[in-house]
């Protein structure tokens, strides 16, 4: 199978080690899921628990994920009690009001970017060092197709999710040699309070089944899809089996990543 894009290697050219998952209390692996009291986060938390994970749930409240002191205290308390964190699912997030960029309120616009970028960054910054110390772990960032293209009516959300993809890539690069893997998960359009309240989805009759999301999270958490570290996977289009087969066939260096191809004269090539 191919190595993920920009895989760090050691001085002898060997690929970095696979993450170690030994488990926390009672030998069960430990997951932290933000925004887990409802919607996608709740589905993910329940699926992980059914699969034998110990799940630490973050609420949907905005303040905690953007409050550095609160995040660091919560993570430290989890590690003190459980001994380790094997999986972080950055799910908590908000969308901006669906208005034209030129009519947007600057405070509302920035709040969306702050929650959807600063929140995952603070969680990643607090959790990943513990993963490194324990021999590895996995980070799943709940992203969206909005990261792939600009939006006039949801500009803050699009900007934030593009930035989140860069955070995933940075986590991959910083953590790979330490056994840490990071993924962007596009959940499709799951029927939740948030999506039902969006004008963009008014009248929608077809929704992504939550099980398609949770199946991918469980596969990513298990290590079966580690070749996809730094890349996007999409519920409703991908399955664990299809992703494994694609990786076995060989992934392109920039496949499913955000890369601007400038050609041979690219100054950063």
Each language-model region and where it sits:
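C-terminal helical subdomain
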Residues: 184, 202-269
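The beta1-alpha1 cofactor-binding region of Rossmann-like NAD(H)/NADP(H)-dependent oxidoreductases
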Residues: 62-73, 106
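Conserved mid-core segment of classical short-chain dehydrogenase/reductases
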Residues: 72, 95-110, 153-156
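Active-site helix of classical SDR
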Residues: 124, 160
């Amino acid at each position: 199978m191919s190595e993920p894009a920009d895989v760090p290697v050691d001085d002898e050219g060997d690929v970095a080690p696979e993450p170690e998952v030994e488990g926390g209390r009672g030998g069960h692996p430990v997951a932290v899921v933000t925004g887990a009291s409802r919607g996608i986060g709740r589905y993910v938390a329940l699926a992980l628990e059914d699969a034998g994970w110990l799940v630490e749930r973050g609420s949907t409240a905005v303040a905690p994920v953007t409050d550095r002191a609160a995040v660091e205290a919560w993570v430290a308390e989890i590690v003190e009690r459980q001994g380790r964190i094997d999986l972080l699912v950055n799910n908590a997030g908000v969308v901006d009001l669906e208005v034209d960029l030129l009519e947007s309120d600057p405070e509302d616009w920035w709040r969306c970017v702050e929650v959807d970028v600063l929140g995952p960054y603070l969680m990643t910054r607090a959790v990943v060092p513990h993963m490194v110390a324990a021999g590895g772990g996995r980070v799943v960032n709940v992203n969206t197709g909005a990261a792939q293209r600009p939006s006039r009516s949801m500009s803050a959300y699009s900007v934030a999710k593009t930035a989140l993809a860069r955070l995933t890539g940075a986590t991959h690069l910083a953590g790979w040699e330490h056994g840490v893997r990071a993924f962007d998960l596009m959940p499709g359009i799951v029927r939740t309070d948030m999506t039902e309240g969006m004008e963009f989805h008014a009248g929608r009759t077809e929704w992504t089944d939550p099980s398609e999301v949770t199946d991918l999270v469980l596969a990513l958490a298990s290590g079966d899809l580690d070749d996809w570290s730094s890349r996007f996977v999409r519920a409703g289009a991908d399955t664990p089996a299809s992703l494994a087969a694609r990786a076995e066939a060989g992934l392109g260096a920039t496949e499913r990543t955000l890369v601007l191809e400038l050609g041979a004269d690219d100054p950063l090539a």
